[in-house]
C-alpha cells in the first residue's frame, strides 16, 4: 500500500512473497528497559549508532512507550486510549507496533502487570522487543503479546509478531508524523490485522538514488491525462553495468487525483 504523505509504502508477509517473517533473536544480548508508569516512556532513552530519517526529520535516539509504540520526544506521550491516525490527539511522531492500553512491568505496577520490554542496537538496526506484555484487562478482554519493532539505518521500519494471544482487534497499528497530519493506519479499534508469525514493513523509495531504472513513454512524457478505457505505454529500462552483485528493489508510482495510487514493485538480481 501507499504512498502516504511521507512517501512511505508498506506491505505484509501475507501479501508480498519476498517479505518473509523472520524474528530477530536478541534474547542473549538485549538490555531491559525500565518504566516509571505503564503509560509513559521508559526511563532510558536509546542512543542510535546511525541517523534515522523519518518524514522530514532525522534522529539519533529513540524513545520507547509502554503502550506498544516508539517515538521521539513525542507529544501526547501518556495517551493510553488509542484511536484513528493520523491525528493530532494521538502520540506524535510515532511508529505504532501495537498501540493499545498495555500493562508491562513498571514502577507503578499493579498485580495484573506482566511482561518486559528489551532492546538491542547495532550499526544496521535497532530492535525493540515487547516480550509477552499483557493488555490492561477491560471490557474488550485480556491479551498477551510477543512482538518487536525494528528500525533500520536506511530509514526502513518493520514489525514482527511472534505470538499474539487473546484480544487482538483493539490496537492501532501504523505510523504518523510529528504534527499528526500525515501517516498510515494499518489497523485500528475493532479491526483484526496481525497474527502469529506475521510481519509488515514500511519504507520510502527515492527516485534520485535509483540510477539503474529509467522510465520512458512513446511521446517522452510521464505525465498526462487518460479518458475512460484509454491506455498508454510506459517503458522501464534497466541498466546493470555499474551495479555490484546483489538484490535491488524499486517501485514505479502511479498517482492520480481521481483514483487510488498504485505502486508497481521492481525487483532486480545481479549475479
What do these predicted regions represent?
Residues 242-270:
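Terminal connector regions
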Residues 61-65, 234, 264:
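Short capping micro-motif at the N-terminus of alpha-helices
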Residues 56, 128, 213, 229-232, ...:
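Extracellular/surface recognition and adhesion modules
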Residues 1-211:
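Extracytoplasmic Ser/Thr/Pro-rich, glycosylation-prone low-complexity segments
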Residues 73, 216, 269-271:
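Small disulfide-bonded, cysteine-rich extracellular recognition modules and tandem repeats
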Residues 46, 203-205, 220, 224, ...:
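Generic detection of short hydrophobic beta-strand segments and adjacent strand-loop junctions
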Residues 22-25, 205-237, 243-244:
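Surface-exposed binding patches on compact interaction domains or structured appendages
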Residues 132, 163, 238-240, 270:
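Short beta-strand segments enriched in hydrophobic/aromatic residues
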